[in-house]
């Protein structure tokens, strides 16, 4: 069925993206850390230049297809709630999104592939929903079936991002979709399970652990003590205040941001370069 193929393809795409991100990121960092033949200044310049180049490439791709910018989850939610945006769930947008995500994450920016994978999963589902009869195939198969398949694709995307089939189904049902049925649940669960299984199998083929939840940022098991609750609460309060201040500052500074296409690309490149100087 469509759900089977969607799950397999989403899992394969997620593996390919994460593998390429790992290769590019590792090459960028290891070249600086291990190449002692060049001076420290040369290595820093190389590090910043490559990071800025990756960011520039990613930002420039959005000029080809503007709907590929950002996480893309809002487009998926809009499509599943009756607001049609054919460009946002087109294969062109999906291809640009995949390439752009690989370069933006590899650049070292504080971004990840999780949101884009939801968008990409929905696009893959949309492609199967359209089928071989052209771009308006969903009008023949019915709006409800079209939404079901796109919902299943979005669920598979999130499931492959976090390694959680149930999480993908819950996200699609609670956050993305306004219309839900037992058939949608079965399709979404099948897609999500297959996507996670394929991703785990492909990771196992290159020597990574198969069948276990892996957190790249936590290699060792840690236990907290009761007396640490106080500092945890204080940290949460301070983080909330800091987050509110950052949000307010961003909203105030947004009016001064460059609105031209060249300006937006230059801004992303400059931000990446400045971040690299602090790493």
Task: Locate predicted features.
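Alpha-helical transmembrane segments and immediately membrane-proximal extracytoplasmic
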Residues: 1-279
